[in-house]
């Protein structure tokens, strides 16, 4: 892997353009059910798919590039070009000192959950495939510095596996998946064996499964509706990483991680601080509640160390190295979201890695990611 800056960001987002789905999917068949922009009575534009408004009525999520990072664009012409043009994003990456960038969606949801709510499986698959093709043709083709990651249909699992295989053959290097699909529509619980073919395919193809915090907003408490917008935004940002406690606990105790020894799981936007709590607490309850006598070969912490990665962008790293381990931490810039470290990414890195040995710093900032994505 060729590095100029020594930083691979594993959690950045692309802004999908207004014509992505309407140009790639039959409008004569699906009409207004396709993802598209609509103008509201107040003049603001909003994304709509299958009759549902997306992104809380915003046209995009690009707070880091806005004059006021707490105010998202409400019309397409307000969306900063670095959110949706690869050439402009590369300029920002150079200024931020980012060598490679692993890409997540925006309109499709943090993990594709916007399409997971579509009850019509044919429409869901069409939307998913259009996004996956576009990401390869538009972003990955623009520069090898972009790491494409596919989204998948939730059900049936056979279609999800077929799409993973198709997408990886196109060049996708990761699988972005809603951590709790049963929160989106009536599909089997994620802990059951129904999803084992999906995990097995990711093992076989050597691609990580990326579970993004916030893709299951039901886990975030308290709800932010009815609150002052700025208070709600701060509350959402604080509670989003901690929602991974439930996700990691479920994947451990339900034996998903136990059954799939070679599955690699990225907990995107997880942060680090709750990780120490989880690793101690989960092992304690594992023994205290008698799960250790239920035929588990590994404790929850051992499953984590074998399978998983935390992802942060702001934590002080040194306090967590002895417990979490440098081998299990990834770093991100979170472009172009309001929670991003931009435009102080370089300064933030130096502050966060104060007192960290060079070898550990390299693992967190790029070696782990280079190995994970086979760069």
Where are these regions (language model features)?
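Mid-to-C-terminal alpha-helical segments outside catalytic/metal-binding sites
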Residues: 1-8, 16-72, 77-80, 85-100, ...
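Histidine-centered catalytic micro-motifs
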Residues: 8-15, 210-214
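Short aromatic-enriched loop/helix-cap "lid" or pocket-rim segments at secondary-structure transitions
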Residues: 19-22, 113-116, 221-224, 277-281, ...
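Surface-exposed, active-site-proximal loop segments in enzymatic domains
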Residues: 68-74, 109-123, 158
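Active-site mouth loops of central-metabolism enzymes
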Residues: 74-83, 118, 146-158
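Short glycine-enriched loops at secondary-structure junctions
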Residues: 104-109, 213-219, 335-337
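Glycine-rich, proline-tolerant flexible connector loops at the mouths of alpha/beta enzymes
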Residues: 105-119, 179-186
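Catalytic pocket-lining loop regions of alpha/beta-barrel enzymes
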Residues: 123-124, 139-146, 152, 158, ...
């Amino acid at each position: 892997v060729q590095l100029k800056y020594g930083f691979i960001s594993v959690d950045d987002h692309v802004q999908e353009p207004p014509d992505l789905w309407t140009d790639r999917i039959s409008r004569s068949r699906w009409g207004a059910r396709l993802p598209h922009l609509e103008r509201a009575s107040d003049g603001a534009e909003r994304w709509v798919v299958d009759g549902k408004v997306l992104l809380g009525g915003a046209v995009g999520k690009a707070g880091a590039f806005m004059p006021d990072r707490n105010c998202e664009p409400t019309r397409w012409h307000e969306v900063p070009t670095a959110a949706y043009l690869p050439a402009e994003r590369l300029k920002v990456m150079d200024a931020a000192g980012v060598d490679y960038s692993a890409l997540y969606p925006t309109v499709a949801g943090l993990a594709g959950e916007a399409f997971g709510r579509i009850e019509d499986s044919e429409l869901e698959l069409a939307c998913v495939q259009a996004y996956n093709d576009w990401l390869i043709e538009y972003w990955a083709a623009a520069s090898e510095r972009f790491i494409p990651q596919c989204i998948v249909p939730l059900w049936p699992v056979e279609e999800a596996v077929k799409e993973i295989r198709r997408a990886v053959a196109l060049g996708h290097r990761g699988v972005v998946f809603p951590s709790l699909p049963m929160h989106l529509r009536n599909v089997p619980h994620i802990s059951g064996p129904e999803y084992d073919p999906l995990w097995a395919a990711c093992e076989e193809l050597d691609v990580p499964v990326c579970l993004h915090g916030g893709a299951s907003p039901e886990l975030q408490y308290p709800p932010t509706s009815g609150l002052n917008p700025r208070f709600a935004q701060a509350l959402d940002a604080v509670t989003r990483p901690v929602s991974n406690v439930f996700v990691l606990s479920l994947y451990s105790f339900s034996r998903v991680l136990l059954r799939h020894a070679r599955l690699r799981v990225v907990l995107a936007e997880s942060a680090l601080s709750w990780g120490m709590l989880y690793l101690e607490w989960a092992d304690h309850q594992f023994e205290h509640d008698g799960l250790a006598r239920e035929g588990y070969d590994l404790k929850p912490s051992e499953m984590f160390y074998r399978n998983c990665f935390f992802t942060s962008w702001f934590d002080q790293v040194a306090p967590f190295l002895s417990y979490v381990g440098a081998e299990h931490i990834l770093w991100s810039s979170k472009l172009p979201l309001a929670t991003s470290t931009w435009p102080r990414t370089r300064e933030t890195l130096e502050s966060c890695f104060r007192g960290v040995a060079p070898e550990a710093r390299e693992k967190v900032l790029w070696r782990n990611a280079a190995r994970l994505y086979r760069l």
